[in-house]
């Protein structure tokens, strides 16, 4: 609105309302416009909050879907049966028998280095060879 339009509106308002009711009318109009503006601002902020909430929900849904698909891919790649087979294979490969029979004196003697007869000594000629310099090759 230009300044001329505002003056025309004021002149018409003075003629219709009169000079004594005009100040009250202007105050009432200002209160109404202020309330309307406040309601519009509240509506805008509510809409913006809803939009942010919807964006957050969509983002959370994306993360949930991504997590679910990754979880499903892992389940497809490694079923429980395969996991049990893998576990069994690992246990079989890493199993070491460290038990000794107390009746086996040869094992005890060989481990402790005691009472070795020439008959009980292992034949190392097949495993080790000695070169001219005295170096043992395995």
From Swiss-Prot:
For this UniProt entry, which segments traverse the membrane?
Answer: 2-18
Name the membrane topology term. Answer: Single-pass membrane protein
Q: Which domain of life is it from?
A: Bacteria
In its keyword annotation, does this UniProt entry include Cell cycle?
A: no
Cell compartment(s), UniProt = Cell inner membrane
Keyword Transferase among UniProt keywords: no
**Composition bias, Basic and acidic residues:** 118-138
Q: Entry's Gene3D superfamilies?
A: 1.20.5.3310
Q: Name one GO molecular function term.
A: protein transmembrane transporter activity
UniProt keyword annotations, A-Z: Cell inner membrane, Cell membrane, Membrane, Protein transport, Translocation, Transmembrane, Transmembrane helix, Transport
Q: Where is the region Disordered? A: 109-138
InterPro entries linked: TatA/B/E (IPR003369), TatB (IPR018448)
Cited function: Part of the twin-arginine translocation (Tat) system that transports large folded proteins containing a characteristic twin-arginine motif in their signal peptide across membranes. Together with TatC, TatB is part of a receptor directly interacting with Tat signal peptides. TatB may form an oligomeric binding site that transiently accommodates folded Tat precursor proteins before their translocation.
HAMAP family named among the record's database cross-references:
TatB
Question: Which protein family is it in?
Answer: Belongs to the TatB family.
Protein name (Swiss-Prot/TrEMBL): Sec-independent protein translocase protein TatB
What organism is listed for this UniProt entry?
Answer: Campylobacter jejuni subsp. jejuni serotype O:2 (strain ATCC 700819 / NCTC 11168)
